[in-house]
Amino acid sequence: MSRPSAPRGRTELRSIHERGHERGSAGVGRTALATAWIRAGESERPDRLFDDWLAPAFVAAAGDALPLIPPDAGGRLGALAEMMNAYLAVRTRFFDDELLAAAEAGVRQVVLLAAGLDSRAFRLPWPAGTRLFEVDRPDILAFKEQVLAAGETGPRCERHAVSADLTEDWADEILDAGFRPAEPTAWLAEGIIVYLSAEEAERLLTDVTRLSAPGSRLALEDAKGLAEEMVEEARNIPPLGEFADLWKGGLEGASPAWLGDHGWRGREIDSTTVATELRRPIPAEMPVAGYFVTAQRAVGERAEGERAEG
């Protein structure tokens, strides 16, 4: 796909509500589009942590809209915006590195849960034979495919777009798309767990566990470090309120503990530590924005009563 020019200023973003009224559907996920907006901005920096050259195309395709956050925002809004920009850039780079580490270890099957407008299939240097599955709602994938179809270069792996609602039964859809549960898989749950209830998050991770062969890997974010008062504050700031209203919190307990009880060996690292290592520190006055969790399904180990499907 040809590298589109990034729109300068990047102050416009059409909301999910506007697109939904026009299309008679939910439209493009607001969080997915906001993430693309931030990734496009990061990609313009001389010290960028990654180059998401497709993100500007997604933002441009969204059409005219009010600014997500005005570029000259100051005060608390500006501080929150700075924190979120840094956090999402660091999160993206961290999970880039985790997926590539899995590939280097020999994993050739990758699943991006709630993939949104993720472009890793196109921008990461995947080894030959890599099969990547993007799972998300039909309306989001339809928008994404429309933008991708306008380009000239294909993905750098075998890419499968799987339309499914992760709060419902989705395993059949990914199996029908060619997913092989007997093979080790690198799973990524980026920007999804916190928007699920505890019950929904546990059900999703249970399904992931059931579909994971020994040697599989899982990466996700756990937002237990995000202060509740910060979420409540965001509810009262118009550009951020709709995102805060989507917040459900995810698992009730710590993710590594849950994973350990279900046949995974996991660890977590706080995002501020990662940010410091990447020389993109999150503003000191902000609390820890969240934790990044990585886990591996030990070879020869399965949770009691589990078996590979397919």
From Swiss-Prot:
A GO biological process of this protein is:
methylation
Q: Name one GO molecular function term.
A: methyltransferase activity
Q: Which UniProt keywords apply?
A: Methyltransferase, S-adenosyl-L-methionine, Transferase
Which enzyme type, at the first EC level?
A: transferase
Instruction: List the EC numbers from the record.
Output: 2.1.1.-
Q: Name one Pfam family in it.
A: LCM
UniProt region (Disordered), positions on chain: 1-28
Q: Where is the composition biased (Basic and acidic residues)?
A: 9-24
InterPro entries, A to Z: Ppm1/Ppm2/Tcmp, SAM-dependent_MTases_sf, SAM_mthyl_Trfase_ML2640-like
Q: Where does S-adenosyl-L-methionine bind?
A: D136, D165, L166
Q: Which family does it belong to?
A: Belongs to the UPF0677 family.
Q: What does this protein do?
A: Exhibits S-adenosyl-L-methionine-dependent methyltransferase activity.
Query: What name appears for this protein in its UniProt entry?
Result: Putative S-adenosyl-L-methionine-dependent methyltransferase Franean1_4929
Q: What is the lineage of its organism?
A: Bacteria, Bacillati, Actinomycetota, Actinomycetes, Frankiales
